[in-house]
Amino acid sequence: GETETARFGCRKFEIDPQKGFILNGRSYPLRGVSRHQDRKGAGVAITKEMMEEDMALILEMGANTIRLAHYQHAQAFYDLCDEKGVVIWAEIPYITMHMHNGRANTLTQMEELIVQNYNHPCIAVWGLSNEITAASAVNEELLENHRALNDLAHKLDPTRPTTMANVFMLEITSPILEIPDVNSYNLYFGWYLGELDQNDDFFDTYHAKYPDRCIGFSEYGADANPAYQSARPERGDWSESYQAVYHEHMLKMWSERPYIWAMHVGI
């Protein structure tokens, strides 16, 4: 007969609307990156050595969580995350625009993601979609698709919560935010638009209005060229100097708000 083996690990975690991420009964603030499985010259067909290099860089910067954006990643990388103790957000490629005839495909993607990966202890949450309202109206069809995905995820894996990454334009009163177990937002105040303090204001406003909901920071960042330095860094100058100002602000903002359950730098 055939034999199938699978590694597994035991851990307990919860996401609290006031205390954030809790691992094995202790506060464990999640700070990390959003990773794409992609390399110049290799595309998505990256080697195990490339995966190990990615992981080494991520750990060197002090990260303890990775959002695997925005699709299924290689089993070898999930294994690596198990070995290194990195907390994972895994999600399906349901991105930016809802397609009228795409419902069945999203459900298949979710089923395959969970069935193939549920034994990996590194995975903490299943992601339903990414910035799906960027080019789609919040209508009943969109809501129903997310309800179906949410129900399927709970049916296949009742041990893990669901989440989704919401685009910054989505109003915090939107009914789609009521569907997943925990929420998260992609915000780029201080880079693409606005000022850095608007990130602080957003989370303060959200938490004040919905103190019993869990909220995370699923994407943020500022592009830079290391060759560009400035004595007077400002938004949009592409300098490494401004990028440093940006990330220093974000880390301070996050450290003062323990309820933010995770932060993932957009890469």
Where are these regions (language model features)?
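Substrate-binding clefts and catalytic carboxylate motifs of secreted carbohydrate-active enzymes
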Residues: 122-126, 144-167, 173-267
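Short, internal active-site loops enriched in acidic
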Residues: 131-132, 168-170
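Short acidic active-site motifs
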Residues: 76, 171-172
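Active-site-adjacent substrate/metal-binding segments within catalytic domains
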Residues: 2-147, 162-163, 209, 215-218, ...
